[in-house]
């Protein structure tokens, strides 16, 4: 039976991916911090096994992942968080919290597992389309996602000689407990079910980058191609800033 390891599996996209893979006869190792939520997943799906640890703690991450007797070929690094600064007011403590999860949390998992990677290994890194262009108050979140997107792409280059695949995922707005906290309009908001289907299909067909919803993400990618002054003018217009 196929196996997948998913971090951030206790809610949102990660939870939906865990449920959908389990429903398609995969063995799922669901990783997260909240043991109660992980227990709920295990109780609903016999093919889900939980693994509780904090991705921001390298020793906790290494200890937990060392318990795996066999490394799944598919590894989905999905754990993430989001916080926004007050307009133009830098809060380094907030930046550290966001980067500790969105960047170092992913790096901790890779460091803990990389010695066991094989030519069958496929690493999927969940970033965000927020990395495409600057957005108001998203200094910490957008920068963390831009960082992990860059890391993902360079890893894809550096690991290709070992036949280790790396896929980057850039979702738009997905309805999750994180986005439920947003105090602004979220155009083309999609469900976790939609996100899971797009991610799983993209993985299955071997895409190097998965982004959705396509109209929204292509719109952002197009803006990113504009000359700087024009790009900033367009962003100001569409965000009302």
Region roles according to the model:
Residues 110, 144:
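Active-site helix of classical SDR
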Residues 168, 184-219:
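C-terminal helical subdomain
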Residues 86-99:
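Substrate-binding pocket helix/loop in short-chain dehydrogenase/reductase
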Residues 10-11:
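Conserved glycine-rich cofactor-binding loop
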Residues 45-59:
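Rossmann-fold cofactor-recognition segment
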Residues 24-40:
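Conserved glycine-rich Rossmann-like NAD(P)H-binding loop of the short-chain dehydrogenase/reductase
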Residues 128:
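Residue(s) in the substrate-gating loop at a strand-loop-helix junction
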């Amino acid at each position: 039976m196929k196996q997948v390891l998913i971090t951030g599996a206790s809610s949102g996209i990660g939870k939906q991916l865990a449920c959908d893979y389990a429903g398609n006869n995969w063995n799922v190792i669901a990783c997260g911090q909240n043991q109660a939520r992980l227990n709920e997943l295990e109780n609903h799906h016999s093919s889900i096994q939980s693994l509780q640890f904090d991705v921001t703690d390298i020793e906790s991450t290494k200890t937990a992942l060392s318990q795996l007797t066999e490394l799944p070929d598919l590894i989905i690094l999905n754990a993430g968080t989001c916080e926004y600064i007050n307009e133009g007011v830098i809060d380094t403590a907030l930046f550290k919290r966001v980067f500790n999860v969105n960047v170092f949390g992913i790096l901790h998992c890779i460091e803990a597992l990389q010695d066991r990677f094989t030519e069958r290994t496929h690493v999927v890194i969940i970033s965000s389309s927020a990395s495409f262009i600057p957005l108001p108050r998203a200094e910490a979140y957008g920068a963390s996602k831009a960082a992990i997107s860059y890391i993902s792409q360079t890893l894809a280059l550096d690991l290709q000689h070992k036949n280790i695949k790396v896929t980057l995922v850039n979702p738009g707005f997905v309805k999750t407990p994180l986005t439920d906290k947003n105090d602004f309009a979220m155009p083309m908001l999609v469900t976790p079910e939609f996100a899971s289907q797009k991610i799983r299909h993209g993985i299955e067909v071997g895409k190097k980058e998965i982004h959705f919803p396509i109209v929204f993400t292509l719109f952002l990618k197009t803006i990113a191609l504009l000359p700087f002054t024009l790009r900033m003018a367009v962003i100001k217009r569409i965000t009302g800033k």
